[in-house]
Amino acid sequence: MLPMITEFINYGQQTIRAARYIGQGFMITLSHANRLPVTIQYPYEKLITSERFRGRIHFEFDKCIACEVCVRVCPIDLPVVDWKLETDIRKKRLLNYSIDFGICIFCGNCVEYCPTNCLSMTEEYELSTYDRHELNYNQIALGRLPMSVIDDYTIRTISNLPQINNE
């Protein structure tokens, strides 16, 4: 009879412990019930990107001196810089510049270390395509300025996310 009583007490303790764990989870669920949703309806609503957002790279062909600093600081040696040495003026002349955004990790080193500031990060992040070869942007595609999210009147912009109170 004694083993039966100890098993019953053990069973009661396990039941109380399980009910406590379920109650803790339920209290966490209830604490999240009065918060505002964090998600947005993406194609119809867009967040305004922060000032230091690292989106697609913008390139200004006329400012580039073909120094290849961007290639040296890139962790994956991504930018392709084709240049020709002009012997009469002893300077490099840029022929072609391209970046493959299918490989780019958007670290921003090329923008940060460019001595002539011919590279800059834009707020454009919608780069998805069905063909990965379309992600290889040459100097013409890199030179196009993106349409600002703020200027698009068909999309509702959300300036900031709801603040989470940790009280």
From Swiss-Prot:
GO terms for cellular component: chloroplast thylakoid membrane. Residues 55-84, 95-124 form the 4Fe-4S ferredoxin-type domain. One of its GO terms (molecular function) is quinone binding. Its EC number is 7.1.1.-. It holds the Pfam family Fer4. Binds 2 [4Fe-4S] clusters per subunit. It catalyses: a plastoquinone + NADH + (n+1) H(+)(in) = a plastoquinol + NAD(+) + n H(+)(out); a plastoquinone + NADPH + (n+1) H(+)(in) = a plastoquinol + NADP(+) + n H(+)(out). [4Fe-4S] cluster 2 binds at C74, C104, C107, C110. It is found in: Plastid, Chloroplast thylakoid membrane. It is a peripheral membrane protein. Keywords: 4Fe-4S, Chloroplast, Iron, Iron-sulfur, Membrane, Metal-binding, NAD, NADP, Plastid, Plastoquinone, Quinone, Repeat, Thylakoid, Translocase. [4Fe-4S] cluster 1 binds at C64, C67, C70, C114. GO terms for biological process: photosynthesis, light reaction. The keyword Glycoprotein does not apply. Its cofactor is [4Fe-4S] cluster. InterPro entries: 4Fe4S_Fe-S-bd (IPR017896), 4Fe4S_Fe_S_CS (IPR017900), NADH_quinone_OxRdtase_chainI (IPR010226), NDHI (IPR004497). Belongs to the complex I 23 kDa subunit family. HAMAP family: NDH1_NuoI. NDH shuttles electrons from NAD(P)H:plastoquinone, via FMN and iron-sulfur (Fe-S) centers, to quinones in the photosynthetic chain and possibly in a chloroplast respiratory chain. The immediate electron acceptor for the enzyme in this species is believed to be plastoquinone. Couples the redox reaction to proton translocation, and thus conserves the redox energy in a proton gradient. NDH is composed of at least 16 different subunits, 5 of which are encoded in the nucleus. PANTHER family: NAD(P)H-QUINONE OXIDOREDUCTASE SUBUNIT I, CHLOROPLASTIC. This is NAD(P)H-quinone oxidoreductase subunit I, chloroplastic. It comes from Solanum lycopersicum. The gene is ndhI.
